[in-house]
């Protein structure tokens, strides 16, 4: 059950809240089903806090410490999680529509089989994150760190991956139709070959696509 004193303190002052948390590191904050719609919690220490089924529509969580926080079933539509530390967050069944994760730490997070359309992951750290079978249509991954990220069977239609770091990124059976991969770093022919692309997919300039039919292709590195 949510703690009323904790709710009042957090809503009144993030600065005082952070001081209280420093002095009470053993207490796990409980905000189960609390209405935080539109609240400004930027730079708040919310490590391991319980936000199950909480309402955070349009909340500002920029720079917040959200490591191992519990957001199962919460409403995070339109929330700003830019520069937040999100490692170990539990987001099962959370509504993330329109969220902003610019420069967020999402390393190893589980986003598999989720509807993440139109989300902004620009410059985020998604190393080893699991996005298998997720709907990532029109998602922005500009300059994101996608090393060893799992995109197996994901829908990346119209995704913007320009300048992303993709060494070891898993793309098996991912749909990259109309995706933008210009200036992507460390992308190999084998990675492209394992995915589905179309003639509107924009690959890096160091790769070349040879179409053998309407759907079949061969990818190779350009000779220098």
Task: Place the predicted regions along the sequence by residue.
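Tandem repeat scaffolds
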Residues: 5-8, 15-16, 20-224
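Terminal targeting and flexible regions in eukaryotic proteins, enriched
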Residues: 1-2
């Amino acid at each position: 059950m949510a703690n009323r004193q904790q709710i009042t303190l957090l809503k009144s002052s993030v600065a005082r809240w952070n001081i209280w948390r420093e002095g009470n590191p053993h207490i796990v904050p409980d905000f189960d089903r609390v209405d935080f719609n539109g609240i400004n919690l930027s730079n708040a220490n919310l490590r391991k806090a319980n936000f199950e089924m909480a309402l955070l529509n349009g909340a500002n969580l920029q720079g917040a410490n959200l490591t191992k926080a519990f957001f199962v079933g919460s409403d995070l539509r339109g929330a700003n999680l830019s520069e937040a530390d999100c490692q170990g967050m539990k987001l099962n069944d959370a509504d993330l529509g329109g969220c902003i994760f610019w420069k967020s730490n999402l390393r190893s997070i589980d986003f598999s089989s989720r509807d993440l359309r139109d989300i902004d992951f620009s410059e985020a750290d998604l190393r080893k994150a699991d996005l298998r079978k997720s709907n990532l249509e029109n998602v922005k991954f500009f300059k994101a760190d996608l090393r060893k990220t799992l995109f197996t069977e994901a829908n990346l239609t119209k995704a913007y991956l320009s300048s992303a770091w993709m060494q070891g990124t898993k793309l098996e059976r991912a749909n990259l139709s109309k995706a933008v991969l210009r200036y992507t770093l460390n992308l190999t022919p084998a990675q492209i070959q394992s995915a589905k692309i179309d003639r509107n997919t924009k690959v890096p300039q160091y790769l070349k696509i040879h179409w053998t039919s309407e759907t079949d292709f061969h990818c190779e590195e350009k000779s220098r």
